[in-house]
A protein has these predicted regions:
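Radical SAM [4Fe-4S] cluster-binding motif and immediate context
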Residues: 67-180
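Glycine-rich beta-alpha loop elements in corrinoid/cobalamin-binding modules
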Residues: 1-59
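A structural signal for well-ordered alpha-helical scaffolds and beta->alpha junctions
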Residues: 20-27, 62, 113-116, 145
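A short, sequence-level motif marking secondary-structure junctions
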Residues: 60-66
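A conserved amphipathic helix/loop scaffold
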Residues: 50, 62, 77
Length: 180
């Protein structure tokens, strides 16, 4: 949640709490004690008003085991009817841009190339033709970017949307992009 969490919670008393950060690990934790607010103190990223109406802020939740998360496309709720799929291969960003809410999210956490290959195969089997790669800066690491581009070449019928930082575009990577 972005914004003034305390103000939001006071303005909308029917909202019990909001999460700040990455919720994949902490939301299930909260579900085990959602009706016991006295147990919410140790849930990272949770912001709420306690029983005395005092604002509690448990900071920002971060998923440290990014590679262990269950891929969204394995969920029974995943919507395969869209013309595209979003694919996150990294989390975090090495930049600290003042205008960006993601800046300074360190460390950068990555999925293995094999993990991404398996996910691409699943996506391909569902007939998806467009993938939006959600990485903050696809080419932050030239070697990894090249590996991913080579992997993408294995799926010529899929279009990949990438966000590339022009200042980090090496000659080596430019040559790799020309092959696409």
């Amino acid at each position: 949640f972005l914004g003034n969490n305390e103000l939001f919670l006071r303005k909308y008393p029917f909202v019990d709490c909001v999460f700040r950060g990455e919720g994949e690990e902490v939301f299930p934790q909260w579900l085990t004690c959602w009706n016991q607010p006295e147990l919410w103190n140790d849930i990272a990223g949770l912001c709420y008003l306690n029983t005395d109406k005092q604002y509690r802020d448990n900071g920002t939740a971060r998923v440290l085991n990014f590679s262990r998360l269950i891929p969204p496309e394995k969920s029974c709720f995943f919507n395969w009817d869209k013309p595209f799929v979003q694919l996150e291969t990294t989390r975090g960003c090495f930049n600290t841009c003042a205008f960006c809410v993601s800046g300074g999210e360190k460390p950068i956490r990555t999925l293995s190339i094999e993990n991404i290959r398996q996910r691409l195969q699943t996506i391909h089997e569902h007939g998806i033709k467009n993938i939006r790669v959600l990485d903050r800066t696809f080419n932050y690491n030239t070697h990894r970017a090249k590996e991913l581009l080579q992997l993408f070449l294995e799926y010529p019928d899929i279009h990949f949307h990438l966000e590339i930082h022009p200042a980090l575009l090496s000659e080596e990577l430019k040559e790799e992009l020309k092959q696409l």
